[in-house]
């Protein structure tokens, strides 16, 4: 099988063949025909060559060591030479045509006499001529020899004068041209095809389209325009409300939200969409848009389907209205009505029940709030509600840095170190910035606070937008950059040293040297070459018998025996002529020619007798040198030396150098007196003082409260901050921070630069300056680490508790927590416990006067003894019936933790023997308990062997549980159920108010609470078949306080756990269960609770340790 072909050397052959077959015919000529012709070429091709492949495989052949030989046909690639048939295209004139001037023209065998050849052997005759070669002529209605036959052509067709054949006019066909063109064709010989679309008919002569109803356009390609339909789109659509009519029938297609023949009926309520086919999904009384289905919510709701109540703080339609409730009042999401917190009343909860500045149950406590910054003091708790911009326990602090507004919860948007107004959030921009958020730098030319100051920088210096200080360009210095760099320095800040030598001037911008006359080189280190002198050494010496000329002035240095300006005279000075006998009349040191006595003027002079100086702007020999460009001078250069006459404060050959630092005046002869980095003006010696200094010599500091150049700015620092005289920056005193030291240290910090960490505890406020702690109500100590001592409470622990009968007092509010047997606000009312069932509950006794306490106590003891005797009798009967029965029961086990505030409890399979109370136990938080109403049957566990109750020295109550032999537990039933955590446990009291010899049971009870905790119970016993009446105690958990503890022994792992029971105040109700087999146990209650006859079972869930034990036992 051939997989691929590799052509070698084929392309040159193909190219040659193609060149040989091409011609000059125009291939686009419709009369040019082409055909493919074949030819052969030799190629090398690859193919798959089969071969026999031997391989080995495992098999059961013992003789060959379980190895067998196998064969299979495989393929590999091989190459061979062969012939390849190729094809090439060849073009020539089609049959009936011949080539003429690169075109294929038709050929007629008989020459067309009165016409032209239009197709092979076909002539197109001129009007009035006919025949195969257009040589015959007859009138329009006749044909044949002598034109004797009459033409039979119809519809205006012409007949051939020779044959009588009809030549049909446009739109007709047939032997006599009596037939119209077929459908879909038109024109001459019916050769044209109609272009009409959408079923339109075509005129057989012209091809014009006749559109069907619903279409228009030259080819009927367009639908009727909107609002029109029918034949020629002349009928008007009747559709309403944006309905679209069918372009043919006019039937209306309604938009979403409308229905009916003409779309005139809106969707019925609860429906929407096209044809009203979809059902609205809006909740809470919301209505939906009939077109889109979008929900329009009723007041108080929002969300895509109106399923959400308004967020807290908003109410009404679209939740667009803001609640007006004050002082923590709750706002009704529909109408905005306020539900006030305790202590407030009024339509908006704006009226406190206590007068201003007081709080408490009797409005007798003074609010600790700073009234100036306090919105309100809670009339019940005394809690301070701060005004916007204030925070802290007593509203004595401003918002932390970066926050503002109510509760200091809004984040400031200020940038570039700006302060934020703690009330409004308005940005107080730092100097150099402006804008709402201080994000914009001051415009060029301005600086300072609010960009209100104008810069005073010269010579394109950059002005700091913060303090207006000038950053000079290269070559300038001074407070306002108005002074060139002093002599010998250049560059930025005039910090670079000039390298110019021999009196060369240094450019203060780039440090380039301008050499004095007579010197050259980059650093003016080279004298002029021999024979040259002057500026840039461009002048030529004019000396005859001299040892060169002076490089600066050009004076000739005459050789011995020669004199004169050019050293060309042997006569002594002032003489000339033969024997030097004639006297010269030349002035100003000129010499005269030894030959003719003409004056040769000294440099700087001119005239016949050299009595005149050079014209302004020129100097030197023959006054031919132009003065240099003097920068700071009184006029043109000196006529002799070319030296510039510098103004005060300048020096150098071109007067382009400022006096050296510390000098000023004409020829820099004055000595500056400026101090404290003041800049001396080189012209008159006046001082430009550095910011923060004033005075003629800059020796006086700015007076307090002022800063900047000439001390023109006023400081804006607060709270004792130090103001920098240079830039006005505030150095805050301890306890303050911010741009102008207007903000206290952030919470938790104090002291210098707010770097010290506060040590206050229990939510106490920390003084931002000293770090001293201001304790919250109920705490005291240096760091507020101590609760108020016993019998005191409140702010500063200055209020005395008013609780009686060994009751405890809340260290914050002073609320009394009564000891067992007492109730009332001051625990001054005794309580009598009466036992009954759920259907006939006895009420607690009325309040007993304090002076009748002993009588009530004796009566209670008597009743208690009777109850205990009755329970003992029942217990004896119960024990007799329980003998021989299965004693297995679940035990309460607790997941170990360290003071865990959760409800992780587990019911294990059974209680083991010999459980011992361990005093070193972990703690668990007591859960909330609920009022038990009608009980339903729960799983029952029978036969607790013994329950012993003892009281420890620390007044804590302990329950010691001991089970019977765990080997007697039934293994026939093993299931896991999930039960509510509020299944109850009941029991009876003995003479000591404790339980003895009681069974253990669980029952489910309906709750008025909305909480729904669950626990997993492993191996529950068989459920009882009937309802059980149970006694109960309502247990409620107020604020967490110190409490007594009950210890429950755990399983065989000996993990002992203690759970914390919070103080409770509740109505005590008693009951006993009608079924004698269902006796109940009781956990000990805290010392400040009433004695119950029933206690809630702790919420339980299966623990990992319990599961591990179960798997081991199984």
From Swiss-Prot:
The lineage of its organism: Eukaryota, Metazoa, Chordata, Craniata, Vertebrata. InterPro entries: EGF-like_CS, EGF-like_dom, EGF_PEAR1L-like, EMI_domain, LE_dom, MEGF10/SREC1/2-like. Keywords: Cell adhesion, Cell membrane, Disulfide bond, EGF-like domain, Membrane, Myogenesis, Phagocytosis, Repeat, Signal, Transmembrane, Transmembrane helix. GO terms for biological process: cell adhesion; phagocytosis; skeletal muscle satellite cell activation; skeletal muscle satellite cell differentiation; skeletal muscle satellite cell proliferation. Belongs to the MEGF family. Membrane receptor involved in phagocytosis. May also regulate homotypic retinal neuron repulsion. May play role in cell adhesion and motility. May also be an essential factor in the regulation of myogenesis, controlling the balance between skeletal muscle satellite cells proliferation and differentiation. PROSITE patterns: EGF_1, EGF_2, EGF_3, EMI. It is found in: Cell membrane. Residues 105-135, 143-178, 186-221, 229-264, 277-307, 315-350, 404-439, 447-482, 490-525, 576-611, 664-699, 712-742, 750-785, 798-828 form the EGF-like domain. GO terms for cellular component: plasma membrane. Residues 25-856 are extracellular. Disulfide bonds join 33-94, 59-68, 93-104, 108-117, 112-123, 125-134, 147-159, 153-166, 168-177, 190-202, 196-209, 211-220, 233-245, 239-252, 254-263, 280-288, 282-295, 297-306, 319-331, 325-338, 340-349, 408-420, 414-427, 429-438, 451-463, 457-470, 472-481, 494-506, 500-513, 515-524, 580-592, 586-599, 601-610, 668-680, 674-687, 689-698, 715-723, 717-730, 732-741, 754-766, 760-773, 775-784, 801-809, 803-816, 818-827. Pfam families: EGF_laminin, EGF_PEAR1L, hEGF. Residues 878-1114 are cytoplasmic. PANTHER family: MULTIPLE EPIDERMAL GROWTH FACTOR-LIKE DOMAINS PROTEIN 10, SCAVENGER RECEPTOR CLASS F. Its main location: membrane. This is Multiple epidermal growth factor-like domains protein 10. Residues 29-106 form the EMI domain.
């Amino acid at each position: 099988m051939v997989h691929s072909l590799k052509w070698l050397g084929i392309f040159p052959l193909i190219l040659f063949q193609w060149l040989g077959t091409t011609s000059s015919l125009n291939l686009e000529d419709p009369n040019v025909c082409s055909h493919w012709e074949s030819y052969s070429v030799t190629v090398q091709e690859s193919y798959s060559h089969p071969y026999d492949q031997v391989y080995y495989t495992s098999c059961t052949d013992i003789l060959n060591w379980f190895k067998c030989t196998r064969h299979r046909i495989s393929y590999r690639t091989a190459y061979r030479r062969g012939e390849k048939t190729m094809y090439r295209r060849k073009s020539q004139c089609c049959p009936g045509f011949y080539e003429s001037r690169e075109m294929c023209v038709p050929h007629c065998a008989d020459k067309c006499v009165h016409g032209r050849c239009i197709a092979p052997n076909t002539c197109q005759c001129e009007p009035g001529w006919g025949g195969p070669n257009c040589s015959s002529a007859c009138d329009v209605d006749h044909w044949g020899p002598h034109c004797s036959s009459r033409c039979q052509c119809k519809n205006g067709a012409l007949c051939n004068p020779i044959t009588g054949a009809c030549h049909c006019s446009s739109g007709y066909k047939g032997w006599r041209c009596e037939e119209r063109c077929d459908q879909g064709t038109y024109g001459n010989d019916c050769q044209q095809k109609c272009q009409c679309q959408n079923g339109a008919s075509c005129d057989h002569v012209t091809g014009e389209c006749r559109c069907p109803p619903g279409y228009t356009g030259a080819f009927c390609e367009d639908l009727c325009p909107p609002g029109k339909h029918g034949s020629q789109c002349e009928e008007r659509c009747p559709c309403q409300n944006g309905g679209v009519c069918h372009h043919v029938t006019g039937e209306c297609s309604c938009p979403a939200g409308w229905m009916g023949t003409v779309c005139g009926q809106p969707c019925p309520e609860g429906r929407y969409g096209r044809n009203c086919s979809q059902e609205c999904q809006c909740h809470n009384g919301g209505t939906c848009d009939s077109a889109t289905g979008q929900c329009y919510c009723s007041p108080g709701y929002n969300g895509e389907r109106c399923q959400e109540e308004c967020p807290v703080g908003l109410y009404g339609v679209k939740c667009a209205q803001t609640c007006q409730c004050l002082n923590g009042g709750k706002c009704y999401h529909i109408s905005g009505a306020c539900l006030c917190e305790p202590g407030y009343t009024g339509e908006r909860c704006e009226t406190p029940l206590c007068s201003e500045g007081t709080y408490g149950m009797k409005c007798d406590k003074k609010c600790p709030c700073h009234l100036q910054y306090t919105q309100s003091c809670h009339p019940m708790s005394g809690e301070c509600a701060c005004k916007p911009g204030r925070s802290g326990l007593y509203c004595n602090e401003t918002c932390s840095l970066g926050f503002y507004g109510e509760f200091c919860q809004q984040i400031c948007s200020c940038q570039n170190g700006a302060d934020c107004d703690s009330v409004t959030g308005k940005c107080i921009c730092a100097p150099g910035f402006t804008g709402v958020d201080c994000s914009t730098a001051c415009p060029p030319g301005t600086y300072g606070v609010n960009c209100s100051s104008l810069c005073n920088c010269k010579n394109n210096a950059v002005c700091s937008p913060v303090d207006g200080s000038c950053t000079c360009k290269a070559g300038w210095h001074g407070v306002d950059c108005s002074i060139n760099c002093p002599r010998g320095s250049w560059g930025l800040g005039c910090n670079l040293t000039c390298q110019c030598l021999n009196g060369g001037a240094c450019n203060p911008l780039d440090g380039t040297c301008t050499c004095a006359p007579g010197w050259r080189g980059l650093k003016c280190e080279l004298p002029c070459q021999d024979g040259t002198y002057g500026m840039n050494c461009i002048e030529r010496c004019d000396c005859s018998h001299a040892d060169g000329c002076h490089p600066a002035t050009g004076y000739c240095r005459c050789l011995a025996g020669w004199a004169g300006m050019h050293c060309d005279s042997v006569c002594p000075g002032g003489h000339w002529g033969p024997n030097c006998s004639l006297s010269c009349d030349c002035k100003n040191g000129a010499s005269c020619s030894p030959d003719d006595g003409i004056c040769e003027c000294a440099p700087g002079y001119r005239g016949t007798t050299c009595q005149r100086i050079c014209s302004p702007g020129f100097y030197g020999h023959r006054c031919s040198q132009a003065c240099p460009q003097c920068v700071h001078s009184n006029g043109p250069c000196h006529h002799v030396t070319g030296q510039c006459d510098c103004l005060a404060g300048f020096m150098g050959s071109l007067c382009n150098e400022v006096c050296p630092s510390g000098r000023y005046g004409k020829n820099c002869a004055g000595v500056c007196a400026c101090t404290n980095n003041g800049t001396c003006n080189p012209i008159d010696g006046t001082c430009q003082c550095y910011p923060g200094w004033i005075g003629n010599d800059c020796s006086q500091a700015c007076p307090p409260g002022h800063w900047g150049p000439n001390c023109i700015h006023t400081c804006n620092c607060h709270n004792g901050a130090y103001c920098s005289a240079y830039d006005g920056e505030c150095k805050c005193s301890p306890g303050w921070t911010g741009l102008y030291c207007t903000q206290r240290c952030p919470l938790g910090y104090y002291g210098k630069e707010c770097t010290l960490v506060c040590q206050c505890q229990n939510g106490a406020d920390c003084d931002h300056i000293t770090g001293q702690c201001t304790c919250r109500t109920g705490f005291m100590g240096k760091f507020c680490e101590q609760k108020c001592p016993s019998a005191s409470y409140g702010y500063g622990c200055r209020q005395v508790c008013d609780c009686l009968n060994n009751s405890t007092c809340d260290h914050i509010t002073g609320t009394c927590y009564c000891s067992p047997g007492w109730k009332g606000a001051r625990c001054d009312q005794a309580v009598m416990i009466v036992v009954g069932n759920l259907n006939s509950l006895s009420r607690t006794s009325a309040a007993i006067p304090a002076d009748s306490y002993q009588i009530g106590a004796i009566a209670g003891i008597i009743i208690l003894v009777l109850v205990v005797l009755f329970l003992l009798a029942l217990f004896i009967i119960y024990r007799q019936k329980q003998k021989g029965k299965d004693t297995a029961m679940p035990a309460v086990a607790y997941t170990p933790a360290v003071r865990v505030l959760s409800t992780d409890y587990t019911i294990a399979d059974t209680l083991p023997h010999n459980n011992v109370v361990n005093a070193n136990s972990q703690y668990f938080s007591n859960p909330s308990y609920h009022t038990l109403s009608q009980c339903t049957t729960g799983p029952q566990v029978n036969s607790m062997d013994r329950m012993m109750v003892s009281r420890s020295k620390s007044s804590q109550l302990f329950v010691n549980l001991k089970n019977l032999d765990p080997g007697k537990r039934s293994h026939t039933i093993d299931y896991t159920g999930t039960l509510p955590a509020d299944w109850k446990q009941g029991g009876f009291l003995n003479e000591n108010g404790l339980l003895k010899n009681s069974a253990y049971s669980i029952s489910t009870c309906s709750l008025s609470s909305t909480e729904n905790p669950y626990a997993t119970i492993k191996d529950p016993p068989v459920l009882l078949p009937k309802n059980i009446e149970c006694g109960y105690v309502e247990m409620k958990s107020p604020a967490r306080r110190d409490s007594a503890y009950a210890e429950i022994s755990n399983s065989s792992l000996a993990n002992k756990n203690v759970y914390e029971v919070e103080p409770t105040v509740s109505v005590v109700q008693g009951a006993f269960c009608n079924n004698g087999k269902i006796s109940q146990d009781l956990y000990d209650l805290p010392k400040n609770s009433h004695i119950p006859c029933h206690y809630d079972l702790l919420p339980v869930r299966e623990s990992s340790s319990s599961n591990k034990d179960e798997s081991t036992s199984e």
